[in-house]
């Protein structure tokens, strides 16, 4: 599977801002919820885990991959991508986040290919910069489709 194949319809979005990290999580996971990749309990599990453990899913400056354990409400494996024009702070000590990659992993293995492809994409500085400065959903989708 190509990386873009993990993104269901309408799962790539650009938003002006989030009021707080909780709303950023909601933005990030809403298309996965609407497309029945997760249930509402999955989103609550991410928020609860963030309060308990901190934002363990911040991958790099400006980039987060919110997710929870499969048994918390993941129904199918898929991803979403939300770019915030104005970054949001998760904690006082962590870098603010601008790009959220929502992950639903239905089991321990089905998302490994997507994570590998995503890691390669994020390690290429020019592509990461292009994601962080994209102006539209189409630009974001084109970058992911070329990965």
Where are the regions a protein language model picked out?
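Cytosolic covalent-transfer regions centered on His/Cys nucleophiles
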Residues: 1-147
